[in-house]
């Protein structure tokens, strides 16, 4: 009987020690803490699907196909990336060519997803995004979510 008590006490000590180590390292009980330590973006932008449904659908589809949901702002390279992403997609009367990731993102350019969408939706969305990113410096990583 004494042996059983000693085994039980040792087992309790091991469990308490393991839990203490886990709490100190942040491995247990805290998925949020672990996420914040590995966060790969600086800001979050909730894109309004009710205002720009075609653009929102394109962004969502492109992300689901494996394109980045994070945009690293790099305004200086935007024109070159726009040329790269649109070079094999001819213009089409009555439509704009929407790119995801956007040309202003380092992740954009060659291999970006390009869809034909209405000019009003595309240009409205571009203005909306541009206005909200104005104060962010180049190098800022923005996570896009669709609302």
Swiss-Prot record:
It comes from the Bacteria. GO terms for biological process: establishment of competence for transformation. Keywords: Cell membrane, Competence, Hydrolase, Manganese, Membrane, Nuclease, Transmembrane, Transmembrane helix. Residues 75-100 are annotated as: Disordered. The activity can be inhibited by the 18 kDa competence-specific protein nin. The chain crosses the membrane at residues 8-24. It is found in: Cell membrane. GO terms for cellular component: plasma membrane. Pfam families: DNase_NucA_NucB. One of its GO terms (molecular function) is nuclease activity. Mn(2+) ion stimulates activity. This is DNA-entry nuclease. It comes from Bacillus subtilis (strain 168). The gene is nucA.
């Amino acid at each position: 009987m004494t042996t059983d008590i000693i085994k039980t006490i040792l087992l309790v000590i091991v469990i308490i020690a393991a839990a203490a180590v886990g709490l100190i390292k942040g491995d247990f009980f805290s998925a949020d803490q672990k996420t914040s330590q590995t966060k790969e973006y600086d800001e979050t932008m909730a894109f309004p699907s009710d205002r720009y449904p075609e653009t929102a659908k394109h962004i969502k589809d492109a992300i689901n196909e494996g394109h980045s949901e994070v945009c690293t702002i790099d305004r200086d390279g935007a024109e070159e990336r726009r040329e790269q992403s649109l070079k094999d997609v001819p213009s089409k009367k009555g439509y704009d060519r929407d790119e995801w990731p956007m040309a202003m993102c380092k992740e954009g350019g060659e291999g970006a997803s390009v869809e034909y969408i209405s000019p009003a939706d595309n240009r409205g969305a571009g203005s909306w995004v541009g206005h909200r990113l104005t104060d962010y410096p180049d190098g800022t990583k923005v996570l896009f979510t669709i609302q």
